[in-house]
Amino acid sequence: MIQMQTNLDVADNSGARRVMCIKVLGGSKRRYASVGDIIVVSIKEAIPRGRVKKGDVMKAVVVRTAKDIRRPDGSVIRFDNNAAVLIDNKKEPIGTRIFGPVPRELRAKNHMKIISLAPEVL
């Protein structure tokens, strides 16, 4: 469950390390984002010579949340951290690699490029 002011790790090699959610997209009163949702983020920490720099405002897809994700079969999946992948305006990832596992729920939200780059899909 991601809301405004939530700090997230970045799970790709775009050059950002930490980002802060500044808006949850999808409706004027929408408060929370879950896995697969698109949010607007501000880069809070970045590595030198990366594709992005500190202070940039970008869109990102939430790929891991510490809050439980309920599946239709009754099982529950949760992660140790909140993480996102930076995307461009065409919803393509900016980085060329994804770090860490991502859940199957991204497939239902049509983030196939992230699924294909991920080392493990849970």
Swiss-Prot record:
One of its GO terms (molecular function) is structural constituent of ribosome. Binds to 23S rRNA. Forms part of two intersubunit bridges in the 70S ribosome. SUPFAM superfamilies: Ribosomal protein L14. Disulfide bonds: none annotated. InterPro entries: Ribosomal_uL14 (IPR000218), Ribosomal_uL14_bac-type (IPR005745), Ribosomal_uL14_CS (IPR019972), Ribosomal_uL14_sf (IPR036853). Belongs to the universal ribosomal protein uL14 family. PROSITE patterns: RIBOSOMAL_L14. It comes from the Bacteria. Pfam families: Ribosomal_L14. One of its GO terms (cellular component) is cytosolic large ribosomal subunit. GO terms for biological process: translation. This is Large ribosomal subunit protein uL14. Part of the 50S ribosomal subunit. Forms a cluster with proteins L3 and L19. In the 70S ribosome, L14 and L19 interact and together make contacts with the 16S rRNA in bridges B5 and B8. The gene is rplN.
